[in-house]
Amino acid sequence: DQQRCIELLNVLADATSGQSEIFDSNIFSKLISNERGSLVIAEENKIILGMASISFNLALRYNGEYCQLEELVVDQDARGKNVGGLLIQEAINLAKKRGCKEFGLYLLESTKHNQPFYEKYGFVKIGAEMRQSL
């Protein structure tokens, strides 16, 4: 259910930036139909509890693709039930099946408290990221 996923993404935007964003359904459609990304959905009784979006990127340093976690969000009522863990595990499995050399993610200042969660699934901190808004 695209609408439910967009609702969850807006919850994530509010939690990470303090601003509620309206995600573009056209971008969502491109993500699920494009070979450069994928969505992993967790549902129970046809209710979406959470989602993870991942992108697949080419890099010379890997002589192939690597995977990037773009968003991971779990409904407030489903937290503490390992939904996030199951989403991460499935995203990692998708990346492995695709032949990705590495799986990465970024922790923002507002999400760095999640570092122990990701460490449970084998992620290690490797440095700082730099960015420029365009």
PLM ranges: what are they?
Residues 8-12, 94, 117, 121:
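Alpha-helical interaction/dimerization surfaces of two-component signaling modules
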Residues 64-76, 128:
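Conserved acetyl-CoA binding element of GNAT-fold acetyltransferases
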Residues 71-74, 80-93, 120:
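Conserved acetyl-CoA-binding loop-helix of GNAT-fold acetyltransferases
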Residues 88, 95-107:
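Conserved GNAT acetyl-CoA-binding A-motif
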Residues 104-114, 131-134:
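Conserved beta-strand-loop-alpha-helix junction that forms the acyl-donor binding cleft
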